[in-house]
Amino acid sequence: MSDKEKLRELAEITDLVFAMQSAEIQETTRQQALIESKLAKLSKASEDAQARFQSDVGLRFGGADVMWQAWLGQQRKSLNTELAAVLAEKERRLQKMKFAFGRKEVAAKMCAEAAAIKRSDERDP
């Protein structure tokens, strides 16, 4: 196997690794968006419930508002914890993707330089 073929294979491998890292980032971003959507829905439900509690005195006296707020707090805490974990994972994956991108670029540059040298050698008898 020639050096040029080895470089081409190296470039293909680094491209694949970068594509894999990019796919992982997309999945993590999808998870982040899902959690953020759930948090937004929870905030909307909180606003709606607050208006209902203001208009229905029976719900307040029955303690439904307190139970709702406790449940709401637990849900927010859970979702925010999950979001923090996803964001930490996203940051870790971004670092890996940056490294993979660097390798991909170096391999591509090495292939281009090898091709340029070969062309130069072919022109010079």
Where are the model-predicted features located?
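Charge-rich amphipathic alpha-helical interaction elements
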Residues: 1-125
